[in-house]
Every structure is written in structure tokens, then in C-alpha cells.
């Protein structure tokens, strides 16, 4: 039997089954068995850990069997619905026949099963139980700290000791909790003795007595070298000679008392070997604050340089709740780096090592997402359990002894612990370092290549911002010389020897092939993908160039590109590739040659965090982990993108610092649009029989043709003009170190939700302040960075002040009640927008729009299917249930959900929930097929494809584990596709991994293709007011990609819609209308493009990107009207003054823009007349000559 400790052969059996969350009590159970069997012959004691059941079905089967034949059942720490439901029928049946059922420290559904003598918790409360309820209510009023709860737990049995009757069974229940929470071998033994002697049907055993629970310190210190392992005096702890720093470690009291401490011992040993003095503290009740107060502060202030939590939980809370506000206040008081390391409870170390995704859905949420809300960084796996097969995740090849495997003892992951120790040491030393000696590596980006994109980032004026940051660093005491102007800074980084070596930036260093070969531990992995060192990227054949410029102790470098741009074969591969030699060498050079103490990734976003590897819970074989190593990594990130920021935190150890997005403004009207509106205003004011009305109609017709609005009636024309005029656009790019002007503040405040005058003044004050540089300086100095939720400024002013550490929403609470309501309304708008009820909708889901809307698009998908989320007793997401057809009032729509890789990583619980909703709908046997399109299609797929209903009901698709994007955008961006169906090939190759109820992917391109044949509508929500479908390439990569795949599957276009919820309400537009609106409100609007061009080269790059993205929509959907290309050509290329201006600012982007417009013509996306085409070609040739330095100036 799993985890069972048996009695002597031939003795009558008596069985006790303990069903709990984890296996920390397995060791004590094994050790106490011989002593128990001396007094209780035939007794068997088994420990069953619910955390093991998902990955080990045999463990669940053993638990059910043990419950079925147990004489006493103890169930505790069961808080997760999946665990509860797995054994609830067996527990309910056992309750009616066992000698005693003890449910404690668990979900109410488990606690209510308690039946101990006269104590039956399913009966109405009376007597002592009524008193208990009053006491529990009083404890909530007095606070919910672990210390106060434990005090009450010790007090109540003393109060009940002399109360006769049922009170003695209630006392037994409290004593059972005391024994369990005091979880040593002795206390577990005495708990068993106590329960058996009191409740066993064997009367002879009633004479045996149990000792009272041994009380251990609730708060204390642990060290394996101490005589008793536990002390309350820090002076008892050993301290390494010449210790460089002191680090506070937070540990779980339960593991220490159970003597399951091999993982803690390994951490302590590794830290001390590196010269780190440790304060290994523990506290009871899953609240770390008492330990912090007792040992990490003294009269002089903070006594530690960094804090590492080894608990796997949030600082204040556990598996049931999380008090982030209390945690943040405690951590602000310490003001040291806070690192969250976690032991694995839901899988073995070997399973984790082999898992492409790394952590499972519950692990990702509990171990990573919730600590992030406290401000934790650098999430690191450090321990877990072994089965007999051991772990092959690193060359160490760790295995457990048979005894350790049987006891399911925690084992350290030595490779990860070494990394944890080095990361912690570097962060602690960073905090202690002298500013004048601190060396900082600033990382800029240059993607896509050959596009004038070097030194650009989303929403950010990079060089203006960097100039301000460098000057602030100099004032702070950093040793560096800053160029005299922004342009001088730009020239120093991007100029210098760049042209001499044919590179996009100055050559700062050259790393020889010999050095690459001798110094790259994973050389074979890189050479397998890219050939022998030094490769062809950023190389002269003898070595690799390091691009950038050094300014004293600050190096500003350019991150190399992915390397696969323009290579269709690589882009069609379903997974990622190892980084190039140049990419690997860049980070190694920063770490070893430049000697950086900290990196600063400047803006959103680079390629590091998108390199292949696990989604969460990095191992030493994951490329982000290999590349960044133990270097502290500060990341300047847009406040409106918590999803990609979270990816950077989890995969590259980023400590994020938020910056605002550009200020917003109304688009207004310009040139012909304003003239047309003036004419329409006069027209609408005239009486129907006014004589001038006919003449004005002719003028309106001419004006409408001039702005390509002549295909609609006058009323529609008027509405489109108002829509364009009222559209929100960004005013240029954001500059770090430059607060909004008073006019910009007023404009943005006017767009925000209604607020009190006090709140309005507070928001205005925060917008006037410069907090981002201050935040960067704090992060570069190794301070605690206060967490802040991400979002859009006008919808969530809570993102202020910026300069803090961004995090996502609590995944357990998503979707919220408001999001459920809003998602249902948006689903109905989509159905109303389509001429007839669609049978199948292809819905694109991103992480960012869901996190910022608390799950609105997720709720929309559920609403279309006729489902709703299910939450457990604690308000945590537990799954999905179907809405009855009678309540739904329409058929269930089949929804093909394609998730971004980031959604898959950040929202694994929601991924499983969506899959469960589709599965339940597909298996709703009593529903007419005409009212359930999901079931109708699934039955058809099952029959045609010869698969079971589990497979036929799969509707959630995404990338392979550790892979991101469809690469449709890269194919378009590099003009690396021939026929448009090659884009469908890429999409299906990358996005054909089906995610079912288990959350694990299975590649099934055949099912995706079959599903796409029935799609009537493709749809995606517009994520943010700062974005449009033409401003970033991700929209046509996802929505465009699936639309192209649908066209190929069904042989005709599906309708494509955009849901614009950027202003709080909801508007559904056709994609064609959305592109036209954005072209008028943004691309062709002087207010918009002049705002970009004031930032020079970076603004030109943004304009070029919009032209390329427009081409992407034509390639994928054919939904771009020809006039769009005509007007873009006239505005930016055929106008000589504008052309020369753009070429002077950014020659590469200008050439690329002209080439894009010619490519659109060549691909027949528009047909310019011969004169226009010749002029466009001539202009392109002129720009090309200028770029090559041939044209006369």
C-alpha cells in the first residue's frame, strides 16, 4: 500500500489513513511505526499526499483503497477542489463506518465530515460548538496572524478540559490539531496513541495513555549544526569566517519538526560555502511576519542584506489565502531583495526535469504568481521529492535511496541551489556595493534587423530616456561620462565603427572563435542549430562582434537578433531554437569581460525571455537561465503590459520597473476630413427642401471621394467622421524623466473613470512627479521594489506611481464577477454583429487583455459556449459549469480558442477551465444537437477521425511548451513567404498543440484543421487604447494567422471582427472598418505622425512598422482597402519633402517603408496606376541610393 507502515504478519489489522496535502509526515510515520506496533499489534498507518495524485494515478488509487478500509481517517490541508473531489465520495462513505473521522485545517466540506464520539460537525452547533463559533469570530476581529491562531489553539483545550460531555470530543479535535501542527515524530506518535486509545473499537487499547502535545517554539531559528537543531537565540547560530553578507531564510516549521530538512540543510550549506551568513528562521501558521520581526530587524534597523523564502507560499498566507497588503508592508520595512524559492510538491524532481512546461497549473499559481503579488523576484525551484528513477535534469543525476523514496522525503536540487546561492549573493552584494564602483550593463534591442530598429522599444523614446537616466546615474554617483546631447549619445552607440564593419552599431569588442569554443559550456547545443563557432550572425568569420559603447562603468550594448529572420524553414518549425553564438557570447561578455554587477534591459522588449526552455520553474538546461546566469536583471517595462513583464520575471529573473505609456489625445480631424465634416454640418442643418442642399450634396460627394468615404451614405459618413475625430491616439513616445505637461495631464484625467476631487488631485500629483528614474535607481541599488498591478492608465490609475515592480492579477480570482458580466455582454455584441448566428467562432485570447480586464475575454469565450466559471469555498477558480440551455436561450456556440504562449504560461488554471467547459458541452448527452454546436461537431470529429470524445472535444490550442508566436509576423516582416498559404502552414505548425483538461499539450494539427472548417467568424479583442491592429504585428500574427488558416481549411474567407473595449464600453467592428479607422485616425493623421517624428529615428521606425503591419493584414485576410496603400504612399514616400525628412532621420526604415508599398503592389494587394507605381519605384530607388551613400546631398 502506498506510504503504508504495516504491523507484524498474522496480527489483526487496524488501519489509520491520513490524507493530506503533502508528504512531509511520511518520514515520521515510518519512524514511529515500530513503537506503535508494540502497543497496538496489527496497526498500520499510511500517509497519502494529494499533491502527488495528478502525476501519479496509482497514488490516488492507493489513497482511495486506504480510506475504504481505514478504521480511523484523518483528513487535513485539503483546500483545492481537485484534491477534495478526487476522494470526497470515499471520505463520505468512510465517515459512516469508521471509529473516528478527524477533519481539520481544511476546506469546510472536509471539516464537516468530522465525527469523533459525540462530536458530529454535520449537526447544528450547540453547547461547546456554539462557543467555538463565537471564539472564531472574535479571533477574526482581532486579526488573523498565525501567532494569534496558535495561541487560541493552545488555550481552547485547557478551557475544555474540565467541561464534561461532548466538550471532551471537541477538546480531542483541538488536541489532534495541536499534535499535527507540532508535527514531530513524538507528536505524530502521541496523536495516533490518543485517537486509538480514545476511539478504537478495541476496548483493550483504551487503557493506553498518550502524552500531551510537545510545544515547540512558534517562531525560531533552525540550523543542522545546532545540538537540538532549533533555537530562539541568533547568537547560537554559526557564522562563516569573513562572511560577505547576511541573508534571512524563511522555512516551514512543519518540515523542521518532521525532520524532513535535507533540502533546507543543502541551502544553508551552499550559502555558507559562498561566504553568506544565514539566519534560517521559521514561523507557524504560514505567516512569515513573526519571524521577520523577531530576527530580521533589530534596534539599529534591518539585520539582513536579502531575504529568501523557501516556503513555496506567499509571505502571509498559504494554500487557502494570500494577504499581499500585509506582506508588502513587512517587506517595505526590510527594504532588501526578496527572492521566492520553492520546493516541488505536485511532481517529483525527475518529472519536473522532463516537463517541457516546468511547473504545473496549480504550482505556477501558488508557488510563483501569488508570491509575485508580494513583490517576490527570481523564482527558483530548489527541492522536491524523488521516486526510484531519480532525476536526469542535470549531469548530477540525483537519485534517492530506497528508504528516502519510501518516506517521500524532500531532496535538494543541488544544481538549482548553487544558482540560488549565487543569485542571492549577487543581489545582496549589489545592495552593499559602492555606487561609484557599480558596473551596469544596459541592453538595447535591434529587432527586426535591417529596419532602422536598433535602439527602439514599444511606447518608449529610448535614447531620450536613456540620456535622462544616465545623467541621473551620474548625479547619484555612478562613475560615467554622459555625451553632451541625446544625438551625441545615439551617435556614440549606433555610429562609431558601425559602417566600417557593416554592423548596425559601434563595435565595442571582438570575441574570438577560440574563446567562444573554450568558454561556452553548451557549445554543442548551439552548434547543432547554428553550425561551428563563431557562426554567421554578427560575425567576421573569426569571431563575434559585441555592439555598443562604454561610458565609464556603464556599457550600453545592443542585444543580437534571434537569427532566424528570413529563414522560412526555421520559422515553420513548431518549437524554438538555441540562441546564436552571437547571442550567447553577448551575455557572457557582459558578465565576464565587462564585469557587470547588474543588467538593465531598457524597454519592452528583448528576446532573452523568449528563448527556449520551460514556461516556469527554469532548470539549468533552459536558455534564459543559461544566458542570464546569476546576474541581477532590472527591466524597464511599460506599465500596460503585465503579461509579458511577468514572463520576463519568471524566465529571466527580471526585477521590473514600470514606465508610463505615451500621453493620450483625441485624434481630431485634419485636411479633407475637417472640410467634409464642415460641409456635412451645414448639410444636416438645412431643411430637406432647401435649394442649396443639392449643390452641397455634390460638394460632399467630391470631398468624400477625396478621403475615400464616398462608398457610404451621408448618415454613415457623419458617424464615421465622429468616430475618427473621437478616437484616442498616443502623443508621440514616452520619455523617462519627463513628466506630462499640465495640458496632457488634464487630457488624460478627463478620459479616466469618474473620481472624487481628492482622488483626482492625488492622481494629478502623481502624474506631475518623476518616479521612474527613482525606481530604476532603487532597483539598480538592490532595494525591495514595491509591487504594482499592470494596466492602462485611463482605466486603471492604480498603476500610479510608476517606477514599481509590475505584477499580474491573482489567477485564482479570474475571471471576476464584473468580467463575467462584461464578457457575456461582449459575446452578445459579437453575435449581434454577424448577420446570422455563427456555429463556430475562432477566438484569439492573449494574456495581456485578460490580465488587464480581470478575465473579460475568457468570460466571453465561456459565454459563447454557454458556460460559467466555478469557484470553491475560498473564492478560487476551480473549473467550469454549463449554463442550462433553458437559461442560455440560444444554442451553444463552438469556440476554437487559440491562446498566446504568454496566456498559456500565466493563466494555466484558466486554460484548463476553458478546456473543461468545451469538454462538458461536447459530452452534454441530453441536449439537442441543433442547440449544441460543440457536441454536434465533436460527434462528427469522433466518427470521421476515429478518436474518442476526450480528443474530439479539444478546443483550446496554443504553442508547444516553451514556444511563442505563430511566426506569421516574422515571415511577413522579412518577406520570407511566397504564397499566402505558407502563412497558414506556419500558423498551423506553431499553434496546433491542443490543451485539454489536464493542461498538458498534445500536437494535433489534424483536429485543428478539421475544427477550422466550420469557423464562421474569427474574432479578437483590441487590448489597449495605446494599441491598434496596425501599430503592432502581434494582431495579424494571431488573428490574421488563424483567419488565413480558416480560409485554407474551408476554401473561403470567414468574417473577421475586432472587439474594441479600450474605452470601457464595447464596439464590434469588421476588421476592414477597424483598419480604415486606424489609418485615418493614426497613420495619416499629422497630429499622430508628427508626434512620433519629434522623436527622430525611433518615430520613423514606428511609422514604418504600421506600413508593414498593414501589409500583414493584406497577406492574411485581404481586408485592407486599396486606398489605404495609396494614401500611405502619397503621405510618406511620394511627398518629396516628407521623404527626405524621413530619410535623414532613419534611412533604413525609410527604404523599408517604400519597399513594403512596392511589395503590396507586387502581391496584388493594391493596383496603383502606372504613374504612381513609377513614382513609387523612383522614390524607393532614391532612398536606397541615399542609404548606400551614393546619392548626392
From Swiss-Prot:
Which Pfam families does the record associate with it? CobN-Mg_chel, DUF3479
Query: Which EC class, in a word?
Result: ligase
This entry's Enzyme Commission designation comes to 6.6.1.1
Taxonomy, superkingdom: Bacteria
Q: Which GO terms describe its molecular function?
A: ATP binding; magnesium chelatase activity
Task: Give the keywords, sorted.
Answer: ATP-binding, Bacteriochlorophyll biosynthesis, Chlorophyll biosynthesis, Ligase, Nucleotide-binding, Photosynthesis
Q: Please give the pathway this protein is involved in.
A: Porphyrin-containing compound metabolism; bacteriochlorophyll biosynthesis (light-independent)
BP GO annotations = light-independent bacteriochlorophyll biosynthetic process; photosynthesis
Report the catalytic activity: protoporphyrin IX + Mg(2+) + ATP + H2O = Mg-protoporphyrin IX + ADP + phosphate + 3 H(+)
Tell me which family the UniProt entry assigns to this protein.
Belongs to the Mg-chelatase subunit H family.
Q: What does this protein do?
A: Involved in bacteriochlorophyll pigment biosynthesis; introduces a magnesium ion into protoporphyrin IX to yield Mg-protoroporphyrin IX.
This chain's protein is named Magnesium-chelatase subunit H
Q: Lineage in the entry? A: Bacteria, Pseudomonadati, Pseudomonadota, Alphaproteobacteria, Rhodobacterales
Amino acid at each position: 500500500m502506498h506510504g503504508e507502515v504495516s504491523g507484524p504478519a498474522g496480527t489483526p489489522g487496524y488501519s489509520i489513513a491520513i490524507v493530506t496535502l503533502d508528504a512531509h509526515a511520511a518520514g515520521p510515520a515510518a519512524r514511529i511505526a515500530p513503537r506503535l506496533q508494540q502497543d497496538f499489534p496489527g496497526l498500520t498507518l499510511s500517509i497519502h499526499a494529494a499533491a502527488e495524485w495528478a502525476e501519479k494515478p496509482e497514488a490516488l488509487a492507493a489513497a482511495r483503497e486506504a480510506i475504504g478500509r481505514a478504521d480511523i481517517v484523518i483528513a487535513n490541508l485539503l483546500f483545492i477542489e481537485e484534491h477534495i473531489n478526487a476522494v470526497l465520495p470515499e471520505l463520505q462513505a468512510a465517515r459512516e463506518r469508521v471509529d473516528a473521522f478527524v477533519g481539520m485545517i481544511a476546506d469546510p466540506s472536509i471539516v464537516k465530515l468530522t465525527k469523533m464520539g459525540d462530536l458530529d460537525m454535520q449537526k447544528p452547533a450547540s453547547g461547546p460548538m456554539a462557543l467555538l463559533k463565537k471564539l472564531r469570530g472574535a479571533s477574526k476581529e482581532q486579526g488573523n496572524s498565525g501567532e494569534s491562531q496558535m495561541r487560541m489553539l493552545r488555550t481552547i483545550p485547557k478551557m475544555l478540559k474540565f467541561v464534561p460531555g461532548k466538550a471532551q470530543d471537541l477538546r480531542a479535535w483541538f488536541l489532534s490539531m495541536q499534535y499535527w501542527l507540532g508535527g514531530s515524530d513524538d507528536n505524530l506518535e502521541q496523536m495516533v496513541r490518543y485517537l486509538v486509545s480514545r476511539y478504537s473499537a478495541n476496548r483493550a487499547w483504551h487503557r493506553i495513555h498518550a502524552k500531551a502535545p510537545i510545544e515547540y517554539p512558534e517562531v525560531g531559528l533552525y540550523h543542522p549544526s545546532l545540538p537540538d537543531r532549533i533555537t530562539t537565540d541568533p547568537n547560537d547560530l554559526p557564522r562563516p569566517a569573513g562572511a560577505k553578507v547576511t541573508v534571512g531564510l524563511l522555512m516551514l516549521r512543519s518540515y523542521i519538526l518532521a525532520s524532513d530538512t535535507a533540502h533546507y540543510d543543502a541551502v544553508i550549506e551552499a550559502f555558507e560555502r559562498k561566504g553568506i551568513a544565514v539566519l534560517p528562521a521559521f514561523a507557524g501558521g504560514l505567516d512569515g511576519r513573526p519571524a521577520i520581526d523577531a530576527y530580521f530587524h533589530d534596534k539599529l534597523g534591518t539585520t539582513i542584506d536579502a531575504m529568501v523564502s523557501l516556503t513555496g507560499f506567499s509571505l502571509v498566507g498559504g494554500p487557502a489565502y494570500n494577504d499581499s497588503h500585509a506582506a508588502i508592508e513587512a517587506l517595505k520595512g526590510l527594504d532588501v531583495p526578496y527572492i521566492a524559492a520553492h520546493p516541488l510538491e505536485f511532481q517529483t524532481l525527475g518529472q519536473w526535469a522532463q516537463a517541457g512546461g516546468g511547473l504545473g497549473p496549480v504550482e505556477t499559481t501558488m508557488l510563483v504568481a501569488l508570491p509575485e503579488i508580494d513583490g517576490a523576484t527570481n523564482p527558483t525551484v530548489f527541492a522536491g521529492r524523488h521516486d526510484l528513477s531519480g532525476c536526469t535534469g542535470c549531469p548530477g543525476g540525483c537519485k534517492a535511496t530506497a528508504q528516502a523514496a519510501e518516506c517521500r522525503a524532500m531532496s535538494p536540487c543541488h544544481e538549482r541551489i548553487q544558482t540560488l546561492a549565487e543569485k542571492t549573493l549577487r543581489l545582496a552584494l549589489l545592495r552593499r556595493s559602492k555606487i561609484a564602483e557599480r558596473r551596469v550593463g544596459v541592453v538595447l534591442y535591434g529587432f527586426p534587423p535591417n529596419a532602422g530598429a536598433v535602439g527602439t522599444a514599444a511606447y518608449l523614446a529610448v535614447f531620450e530616456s536613456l540620456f535622462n537616466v544616465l545623467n541621473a546615474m551620474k548625479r547619484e554617483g555612478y562613475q560615467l561620462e554622459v555625451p553632451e546631447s541625446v544625438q551625441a549619445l545615439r551617435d556614440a552607440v549606433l555610429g562609431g565603427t558601425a559602417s566600417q564593419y557593416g554592423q548596425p552599431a559601434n563595435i565595442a569588442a571582438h570575441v574570438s572563435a577560440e574563446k567562444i569554443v573554450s568558454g561556452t559550456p553548451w557549445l554543442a547545443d548551439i552548434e547543432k542549430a547554428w553550425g561551428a563557432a563563431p557562426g554567421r550572425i554578427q560575425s567576421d568569420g573569426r569571431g563575434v562582434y559585441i555592439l555598443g559603447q562604454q561610458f565609464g562603468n556603464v556599457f550600453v550594448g545592443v542585444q543580437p537578433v534571434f537569427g532566424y529572420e528570413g529563414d522560412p524553414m526555421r520559422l515553420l518549425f513548431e518549437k524554438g531554437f538555441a540562441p546564436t553564438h552571437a547571442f550567447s557570447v553577448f551575455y557572457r561578455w557582459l558578465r565576464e569581460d565587462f564585469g557587470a554587477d547588474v543588467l538593465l534591459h531598457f524597454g519592452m522588449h528583448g528576446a532573452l525571455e523568449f528563448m527556449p526552455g520551460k514556461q516556469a520553474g527554469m532548470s539549468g538546461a533552459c536558455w534564459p537561465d543559461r544566458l542570464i546566469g546569476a546576474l541581477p536583471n532590472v527591466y524597464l517595462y511599460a506599465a500596460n503590459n503585465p503579461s509579458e513583464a511577468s514572463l520576463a520575471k519568471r524566465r529571466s529573473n527580471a526585477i521590473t520597473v514600470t514606465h508610463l505609456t505615451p500621453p493620450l489625445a483625441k485624434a481630431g480631424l485634419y485636411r479633407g476630413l475637417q472640410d467634409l465634416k464642415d460641409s456635412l454640418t451645414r448639410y444636416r442643418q438645412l431643411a430637406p427642401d432647401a435649394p442649396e442642399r443639392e449643390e452641397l450634396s455634390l460638394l460632399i460627394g467630391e470631398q468624400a471621394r477625396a478621403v475615400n468615404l464616398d462608398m457610404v451614405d451621408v448618415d454613415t459618413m457623419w458617424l464615421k467622421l465622429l468616430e475618427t475625430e473621437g478616437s484616442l491616439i498616443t502623443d508621440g513616445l514616452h520619455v523617462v524623466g519627463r513628466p506630462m505637461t499640465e495640458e496632457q495631464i488634464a487630457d488624460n484625467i478627463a478620459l479616466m473613470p469618474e473620481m472624487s476631487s481628492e482622488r483626482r488631485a492625488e492622481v494629478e500629483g502623481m502624474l506631475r512627479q518623476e518616479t521612474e528614474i527613482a525606481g530604476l535607481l532603487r532597483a539598480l541599488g538592490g532595494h525591495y521594489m514595491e509591487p504594482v498591478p499592470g494596466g492602462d492608465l485611463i482605466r486603471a490609475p492604480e498603476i500610479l506611481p510608476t517606477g514599481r515592480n509590475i505584477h499580474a492579477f491573482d489567477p485564482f480570482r479570474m475571471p471576476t464577477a464584473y468580467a463575467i458580466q462584461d464578457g457575456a455582454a461582449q459575446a452578445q455584441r459579437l453575435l449581434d454583429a454577424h448577420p446570422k448566428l455563427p456555429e463556430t467562432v475562432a477566438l484569439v485570447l492573449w494574456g495581456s487583455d485578460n490580465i488587464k480586464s480581470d478575465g473579460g475575454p475568457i468570460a466571453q469565450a465561456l459565454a459563447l459556449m454557454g458556460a460559467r466559471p466555478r469557484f470553491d469555498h475560498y473564492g478560487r477558480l476551480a473549473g467550469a459549469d454549463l449554463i442550462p440551455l433553458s437559461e442560455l436561450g440560444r444554442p451553444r456556440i463552438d469556440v476554437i480558442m487559440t491562446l498566446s504562449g504568454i496566456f498559456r504560461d500565466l493563466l494555466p488554471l484558466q486554460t484548463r477551465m476553458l478546456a473543461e467547459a468545451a469538454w462538458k458541452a461536447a459530452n452534454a448527452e441530453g441536449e439537442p444537437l441543433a442547440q449544441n454546436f460543440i457536441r454536434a461537431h465533436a460527434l462528427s470529429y469522433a466518427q470521421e477521425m476515429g478518436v474518442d470524445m476526450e480528443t474530439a472535444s479539444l478546443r483550446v490550442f496554443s504553442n508547444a511548451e516553451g514556444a511563442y508566436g505563430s511566426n506569421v509576423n516574422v515571415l511577413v516582416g522579412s518577406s520570407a513567404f511566397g504564397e499566402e498559404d505558407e502563412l497558414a502552414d506556419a500558423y498551423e505548425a506553431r499553434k496546433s498543440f491542443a490543451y485539454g483538461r489536464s493542461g498538458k499539450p498534445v500536437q494535433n494539427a489534424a483536429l485543428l484543421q478539421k475544427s477550422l472548417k466550420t469557423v464562421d467568424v474569427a474574432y479578437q479583442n483590441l487590448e489597449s487604447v495605446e494599441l491598434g491592429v496596425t501599430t503592432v504585428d502581434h494582431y495579424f500574427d494571431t488573428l490574421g494567422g488563424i483567419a488565413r488558416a480558416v480560409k485554407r481549411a474551408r476554401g473561403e474567407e470567414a468574417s473577421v471582427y475586432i472587439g474594441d473595449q479600450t474605452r470601457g464600453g464595447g464596439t464590434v467592428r469588421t476588421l476592414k472598418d477597424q483598419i480604415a479607422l486606424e489609418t485615418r485616425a493614426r497613420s495619416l493623421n499629422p497630429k499622430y505622425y508628427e508626434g512620433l517624428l519629434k522623436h527622430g529615428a525611433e518615430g520613423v521606425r514606428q511609422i514604418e512598422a504600421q506600413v508593414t503591419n498593414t501589409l500583414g493584414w493584406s497577406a492574411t485576410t485581404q481586408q485592407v482597402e486599396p486606398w489605404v496603400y495609396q494614401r500611405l504612399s502619397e503621405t510618406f514616400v511620394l511627398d518629396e519633402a516628407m521623404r527626405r525628412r524621413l530619410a535623414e532621420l532613419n534611412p533604413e526604415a525609410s527604404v523599408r517603408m517604400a519597399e513594403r508599398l512596392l511589395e503590396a503592389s507586387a502581391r496584388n494587394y493594391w493596383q496603383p496606376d502606372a504613374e504612381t507605381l513609377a513614382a513609387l519605384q523612383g522614390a524607393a530607388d532614391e532612398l536606397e541610393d541615399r542609404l548606400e551613400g551614393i546619392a548626392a546631398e
